[in-house]
Amino acid sequence: MRVTQGMIQQNSLRYIGSSYSKLDKLQSQISSGKKISKASDDPVVAMKSLKYNTQLSQVQQYKSNASQAFTWLENTETNITEGIDILSKVRELAVEAQNDTNGEPERQAIGVEVKQLKEQLLNIANTQVNGRYIFNGTNSDKPPVTDNGDGTYTISDTADVVVNISNNMSLKVNSDPKSAFGGTSESGQNVFEMLDSFEKALNSGSLDGMDSVLNDIDHFSDGMSAERSDLGARYNRLELVNTRLSAQEETATKVLSDNEDVELEEVITEFIAQQSVHRATLAVNAQIVQPTLIDFLK
């Protein structure tokens, strides 16, 4: 087959174009740090990246859920602990009120303090974090405990707040108000009603049922302590899961990086080598495509 000058020029241009393409690809890898810039560059790498990115996003979502769960559990435990401390103070006042040396003024003063502690406990029960009532489950836009104004208090029935923290694993992160504040006494009162009755007894001077009051205080304190222990167990479980999620995130990030990221030093070295090849290609092709008719006749 006769090789013409036109064929030589076409081949030369093709080699130069191929060299430019290699340089462009290497330059893109250096600037982005990635092996590919579009799926067509390497479909296998692209498919693996899609898979690994999905896995990493899922793990990161679980970690975000776990972070929210930690916040909810920590706030709940803190407030229940404050509630237990309040009842401990109320118990001290109940014991003090039984002292025969206390007259009516002293017991009424104790009654004022009990009222303040009751109001403080009510504020704890209706605690809001980021605009949400943490003790009212999924109905977090409304306060869980309502003062009816007649010595009775309504405590909401709530649905649990459940958070997905891993594949096929979820965790209850809230405490419903009835469990969080000790349930009800043998007489059917909740803790707020018991405190209200105790306050009224102090103001009226009727202290015949003080043993019952002390028993009720212990009952509510025990119930709240049990709920706090349950919160602690859930918190420990969450910590274990979160540790595993952190390890999974680290692994997924590494696998994704190994699949997508270039070894920058290697690519730079290859780029420099390709530049040398490109310059040589240009020089050689310049000699090939330049000859004129006179050059051939020499």
Curated annotation (Swiss-Prot):
Gene Ontology CC: bacterial-type flagellum hook; extracellular region
Cross-referenced InterPro entries: Flagell_FlgL, Flagellin, Flagellin_C, Flagellin_N
Entry annotated with the keyword Transport: no
Pfam families: Flagellin_C (PF00700), Flagellin_N (PF00669)
MF term (GO), any: structural molecule activity
Primary location recorded for the protein, binned into one broad class: secreted
Family under the similarity heading: Belongs to the bacterial flagellin family.
Protein name (Swiss-Prot/TrEMBL): Flagellar hook-associated protein 3
Origin species: Bacillus subtilis (strain 168)
GO terms, biological process: bacterial-type flagellum-dependent cell motility
Highest taxon of the lineage: Bacteria
Keyword annotations: Bacterial flagellum, Secreted
Keyword Secreted: yes
Subcellular location: Secreted; Bacterial flagellum
